[in-house]
Structure formats: C-alpha cells, structure tokens
Amino acid sequence: YDIDSISEKKAKIKYTVNTGTAFFIDSLKTTILSPALDSLYQTRKSNTEIKIGNQYKTENFNSEIGRITSHFRNNGAYLFQQNYISFDIDTINKKNKVGVHMKISDYEYREGDTSKTKPFKLYKISGVNIHTDYTPNQAKQEKKDSLRVTYNNFNLFSQGKLKYKPKAITNAVFITKGGLFSDYKITLTSRYLTNLRVFNYPSIQYDLDPKDSTQNSLIANIYLTQRKKYSLISSLDLTHSNIQDFGILGTSTLSIRNVFNGAETFDIAARGNIGSSKNLANPSDNFFNVLEYGLDLKLHFPRIFMFFSTEKIIPKSMIPSTVLSSGYAKQTNIGLDKENFTTIFSYNWTPKRNTSTRFDLLNIQFIRNLNTRNYFNVYSSSYNALNELANSYPNTNPAYFDGDKNLIIESGTDGFINDVLNPNSSLIVTTEDKKEINNINERKIRLTENNLIFASNFSFSKTTKNDIKDETYYGF
C-alpha cells in the first residue's frame, strides 16, 4: 500500500491488490459417517454449491455449509451443527487445481470425563405441549393443578379454564406429532403465534421423550406468555409541514385482545389535530384554523373468512388474516370541510419471505362536503376569472356585487352563473365566455358534490431488505 500525507496529522492510504492465478475444483469427494445423514445428503446432492470445474471461492463453501446444515436440521437432525462439516483442500501435484474432500463427522458428546462419538439420528416429534399462560417466573413444567385439553394431538395446558378456542392456537402451530424435527417449522410457528397479537414472542423447547427406549423421539414444549387483554397507548405530538405551519396532534388507541376467544383483536383508535395554516382562506383571522378528528375501528381475525376453503390457495404457512375496519373522519380547515366514512373488508397474507399481499374485497368510502358555500373562497383562481367575466358585462345584475364591484360569495357568484346558463335569461354573453363559465360551474359541482365510492383493490409488495443495517436493497 501507499501512504500519501495530505495535511498535518492526516494521510490517505491507497491499497493495491494484485490477484494471483485462480484455482479451479477438479475433484470432489464426500465422507459422511452417519448413515442417516448420508441418505439425507443424497436427496439434495444436486443442489450443491461446490461443483467440479467451478472456481474455488470461499463464499461457495460457506454457502454449502449453510445449505447442508439447514437441510439436515429441517429433516430431523436435531443435534446437528455447522461445526461437524469440514473440508480438506488438496493442491499437491496440481497446477491451479484443487481437490475437495468434504467430511461430516459423527455426533460428539461427553460421558463423564470421556469424549465419545455416535452416529446422528433423525428425531421425530412424539408430543406437542402448548402452555397457554406461561409466566417467566413459573417453572417450565405442568403444575399439578394445570388443566389439560387435548385437541388434534396437541396438549394445551392452562391454569384454570382455557381462555382460547383450541383451534385458534393449534392452527398457528406447524410442529406436529409424528413429524420430523424442523428449524423451519419452529420459525414458522413463532411467526404465526406472534402474528396473533395476543401473546409475546413464544419460547419453543425440546426434550427427549423418556417413554421412548430408542431415544429417537422429542417432546416439543411451546410456552406462551399472554399479553394484557386491554391496553391503551396515547401520544401527543407537535407537527409542522408545508401545509400546516403549526399543529398539535393527539392519538389514543385501545386494544382488546381475544375478543371472541379465537385470538381476535379489536382496536379503537381516536385522533385529533388542531393547527394553524396561513395558506388557507381565513376571513376571521383565527390562529387555529385547522381542525381534524376521527375514530377508527378495526377487527382482526388471524385466518381467512370465506364461504369456501382457501387452504389450497392461501395455505396457513402464508400467515393469512382478515381485517374488517370502519372509520369516520371530519376535517374543518376554513375550506370545504369534509366528512369521510370508510368501511373496508380485506385479506392479508405473506406468500414468501419479504413479500406481502393485500386484497380489499370491499372498500366503501362516502365523502361528504360540509361547507360548499366556501368554494370560491378556497379556489380563488376560479373566483377571479368569474368576477372578471361578470364585470365585463354592464347588464349583469348589480345586486350580485358588493361595494367594491366584486361578486358576492355565494349569492353573487351562483346568481351570475345561473343567469349565464339559463337560456331564458336576459343576460347575453359570448359563446366563448359562456363555455368558460360553464367549465367553472362544472368544476365547482365536481369538487363540492358528495361521493360514494365502491372499490376492490389488490396490492403486492416485495423487498430484499434483510434488516435495518442492510443498505443495498430494493422494494416495490
């Protein structure tokens, strides 16, 4: 490297890297001591990241270790870890070529002071216990006074009467009796149970089944800590934007969990904003001339509500949910002022990692304008054009003007428009002016009329972002 002193106590370092001749893989050998793992490896051997003829790259070896570990641990190899995989690289008597020997050793354990090995086993699940009201200071075992409910080969334990419908919880569990141990199923189960929003992040642990003499079986214990049935979150913020110079925003949300004993959640959110904006028409010169408030109701079901089964289209591994929401909002800002009523019935699911899908089966909005008389105060350009046209005709009704010869809002503006568009009126204007006045009127009608909107929407989003530190990603 070169060091360039650019100033006192500062330097620039320039690294020059000269790469050597690349090495290529000319042979590949595998030795797997455990028969169960060897058979498992052969089923996905074609997916290897290390192939004869490819350039030697460390990243490919790291990827292969991850691939094999994931494959084994998702198919019963409960005790397997990455450190059991090693590679011997042979470059003796080879020119720019390497021979690769991958070794997967047996399971190592200690018995007293002696280190021993034995072949890896593939473990099956012999039982699934779900502890529905676990607390951190509680011993992780069923208490003698625990109540147990058995449903579809799941054992649900509770202190007292079970607060949930068994199906609501077991639907979120992908670890099943008779299935192989799988890291993927642990991750999927944790995600689904968290998505229910009635429990904290679950703890999932495995123990050897003492009843199995072959020691090939595991008992899965899922510990669920209930969140409070009622929670209230409030906030108060001071805001500033290009529309609102100063604002005070307050929000408050009440969440009610497990509403119908099926892990449903019901949210009631109220919000209010009072602010000041000098960009709005403000004839009374009030400092606070913006007022908005609203109320939103949202009912969340952790499943798809449909009159037919959707399991084949949207399997539960996609963590589907149904949301019914309704809202009311009112806006008073010395403008037209609006009321907005919304009702949405939507489905949500995640087809793959980092993707999300939403389908609004029904989206209804009713928008009501409350202060249509203020239209020409808000849309001053339309008013100025109309006022200029009215003053250009001497026979315009003088009652339409104030003392400064400006059209009076609203009696003067509407009266002038009606006279121009009325074929029986004595006020005669040019065809071009009549067309312009008609356009102003149509725009006024369009922007002041109430609207009832029915819609269905489908949205899909995807991102490659892995975490908050990932700076090289895309999303759409």
Describe each region flagged by the PLM.
Residues 195-200, 224-230, 256-265, 306, ...:
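Secondary-structure transition/capping motifs at alpha-helix termini
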Residues 105, 131, 176, 207-209, ...:
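Outer-membrane beta-barrel pore domains and translocons
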Residues 74, 164, 287-476:
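Transmembrane beta-strand segments of outer-membrane beta-barrel domains in Gram-negative
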Residues 233-240, 246-305:
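Predominantly transmembrane beta-strands of Gram-negative outer membrane beta-barrel pores used
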Residues 46-50, 226-234, 276-280, 318-325, ...:
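Flexible, solvent-exposed coil segments and beta strand-coil junctions
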Residues 221-225, 235-253, 429, 455-476:
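Extended beta-strand-rich architecture
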Residues 1-237, 253, 271, 276:
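Periplasmic polypeptide-binding modules associated with outer-membrane biogenesis and secretion
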Residues 97-99, 170, 188, 217-219, ...:
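Transmembrane beta-barrel architecture of outer membranes
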